[in-house]
């Protein structure tokens, strides 16, 4: 069981992310900060992203890059390029 020694320093961050398939891997992309990861399954991609985010937020100044997102939608469009 994980215990927090100093609960006053614990901050919860709500994280929004998307997962998409690229080749044989699933890519997990965080929308709040520029962090991504991947895995061979959706669950693995999500778990790997969570681990990467925990490492990222260990930096005392990483919270400055955090963008709070209350709602996220996925859209699709077509572009005609020359």
Describe the predicted segments one by one.
Residues 29, 38, 56:
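Residues that scaffold the ATP/ADP-binding catalytic core of kinase and kinase-like folds
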Residues 33-42:
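A short, exposed loop/beta-hairpin motif centered on an aromatic-Gly-Thr core
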Residues 27, 35-36, 69:
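Intrinsically disordered, low-complexity segments enriched in Ser/Pro/Gly/Ala and basic residues
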Residues 1-15, 47-82:
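Short, charged, surface-exposed hinge/linker loops at domain edges
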């Amino acid at each position: 069981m994980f215990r927090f020694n100093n609960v006053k320093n614990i901050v919860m961050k709500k994280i929004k992310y998307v997962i998409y398939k690229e080749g044989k891997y699933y890519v997990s992309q965080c929308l709040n900060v520029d962090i991504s990861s991947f895995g061979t399954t959706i669950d693995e991609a999500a778990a790997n992203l969570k681990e990467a985010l925990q490492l990222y937020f260990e930096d005392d100044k990483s919270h400055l890059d955090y963008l709070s997102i209350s709602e996220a939608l996925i859209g699709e469009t077509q572009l005609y390029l020359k």
